[in-house]
């Protein structure tokens, strides 16, 4: 699955900004606030909260859940296994290295497969792209971009071809850069919502 968009492939795992970004995500995923996360918590949020509230079909929800499970297992998470932040961070490093190696070889990445699944849910009109309104619905429901301003900033950041709509390739490129490598082209991806 080749991409027309280049991404910075060098990681910067010791950068305090990268660590802070992942600490934000860890805290966001720690639903019960006990300082540990499990795959159970993540799947519950993804399937029971987000997919349900976006009106996903059972098939879409299952596909999305399969991708969420694969992605976070790539970070070392499992059902029933409590993971603290240092272990979570190490897992992200492993996931980032594995996905970036796949990206460099034009192979499907876990983040792209998850993107394909979530796009199928967002894309209500079946156009193959999502609109700003479709993105705003996700941002509001997921809580990752809770304000209209943050949603608009994310959308603008990801609209690499300036078409006024987003395709999964644009979103994947920006998320790889944001979560994996601190690519300056992806900085500010979630507006003020995520460091």
Curated annotation (Swiss-Prot):
Signal peptide: none annotated. Gene3D superfamilies: EF-hand. Keywords: Calcium, Luminescence, Metal-binding, Photoprotein, Repeat. Pfam families: EF-hand_5, EF-hand_7. Ca(2+) 3 binds at residues 159, 161, 163, 165, 170. Belongs to the aequorin family. Ca(2+)-dependent bioluminescence photoprotein. Displays an emission peak at 495 nm (blue light). Trace amounts of calcium ion trigger the intramolecular oxidation of the chromophore, coelenterazine into coelenteramide and CO(2) with the concomitant emission of light. This is Obelin. The keyword Repeat applies. Ca(2+) 1 binds at residues 30, 32, 34, 36, 41. One of its GO terms (molecular function) is calcium ion binding. Residues 17-52, 53-88, 110-145, 146-181 form the EF-hand domain.
